[in-house]
Amino acid sequence: MILKLRRLEMRPRAALCAALWLSACTSVPLPQGTSLSSYAGMSPSTGILAKARLRVDPAPLLAAQTVRIVPTATQIGSSGFDPKDLALVANAVDRALCTDLSDRFQVVAPSLPADLIVHATVTDIVATNRTAAAGSVVASLGASVAGLGVPVPRLPIGLGGLAIEAEAVDKDSSQKAAMLWSRGANIITTKARVSTVGDAYSLSSAFAADFSRMLLKGKDPFKGMPAIPSMQRLRASLGGDPKYDACKAFGTAPGLPGMVAARFGLPPTWTDKGAAVSR
């Protein structure tokens, strides 16, 4: 009898968990832009949270030793976003790509030849609702002050998202890897920030990790176990100098001040100074 009651009690809990999970992420389309040299031969591949279509040529990627990064562009039409916010998101993509690719490749300056040339384009940004984000921040901080000791999920409304397409071409402009990628914020792992590009900014590093892994390993980045971050990645994420001077063009990560700002839901512009050189 007790077991039967427990089963009956668990059913609404399971239904609630399922409902929360379904509402935990915002859905972001996977648009195809016009910035890639080719969209042929791309196959669907889906991670736990991201949607993607990709094409990868393993042999030339694994043989490559140097890479050059072309600054990320935006191709989202009349969006209503502040140009400074868009530039910050684009630069965050570049900075993360530069750091992640440094694990195996030597990143060279724009004026130097490279085995691979990487460029990305932001094709869509789903705006973060600042009012909803502020409510989530207040609820989270209130729980901390009350000493509940339990993380409070974000409100499942007004979540933002990001869509990007990117490719790596060789010296002859022949495409060796390409990816269409999109991902929405979720109520568990994406911290609310009171900025229309708050979630897009946070998700920029997730895209960079997926795309870089494809180039580093020469295969679908969504298959297999995620790698442990290298020491140079950790150092750069904490605001340290990057491994290669070419990455200094994208500025340094906000580090600990940025983490504190994210905890309090402050806009990324408060702590991220953006590119070190004009784009």
What are these regions (language model features)?
Residues G147-A163, V169-M214:
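Short secondary-structure boundary motifs at beta->alpha junctions and helix caps
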Residues D103-D115, G218-P226:
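Surface-exposed patches in mature extracellular/periplasmic domains of secreted proteins
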